[in-house]
Amino acid sequence: GEEIFDKEGNITKVLHKSDIHYNPCFKITFDNGESIVADHEHRWLISFRNIDKTFREVVMTTEDIAKWLIDKPRTSYNIPKIMNANPLNLPEIELPIDPYVLGCWLGDGSKSCGIITNINSKVWEEIENRGYTFGGDLSDGKSAEMRTIYNIRKKLNDLGILNNKFIPDLYMRASYQQRLDLLRGLMDTDGYYHESRKRFVMGTTQKWQAEDLLRLVSTLGIKATVFEVDKKCNGKIFKGWDVCFSTDGLNPFLVRNQDIDFPSK
């Protein structure tokens, strides 16, 4: 009777629970570093790439996959893949803060108040277009503009994210467009496109923030990978995490990088 998401992104109910078995198990590690333990008879819907770049699907057991990987040469056409699930199909809900504006604050906002620091005038225009007003520039005129977004501090506090930045579950379960707006606010303020890797990247110094972004991206049907990296600031080197992903023609920016020629995944 519990509700879960199916591979199409729709909510469905659990109709049956299998018995407990004591079968041989395999640990499967995916190319993004995540692992899962499954018994040898578990059936997987596997995709193989064709020469024309389309995919064919077959059902294989865990044991079948293990034998396949041992016996077959490693080519792009012989590596079994589990295709991404579709974006979560959820209704639009009322949110206390516009998701794009919240994304901007999570990306470039002061954790203790409603101030956002940004150099791009189009970001400010987009925030204003969404019905928000802000104060004058608080910077020294030599750096990015710092402006207070009015009437969001209390809402940030009510969401429990003031002085504690994270993506609230309420936003993780909003509609597709609302979740995409949230991602675009984050990317417009704190993301970039890596030209040589042909990947979209957002970096953070907090691992749990990287995991938050990974969750958000996955709800949009996009596969992302987290890399631990060394970051440098003011001559000091410290640990950080980059969340990297590609898309099938979807630009995760809204007002920035509209002219980049990125390949589909």
Go through each PLM region and give its residues.
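Intein-associated homing endonuclease modules of the LAGLIDADG/DOD-type, together
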Residues: 1-10, 15-236, 242
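Polar, glycine-rich mid-to-C-terminal structural blocks
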Residues: 234-265
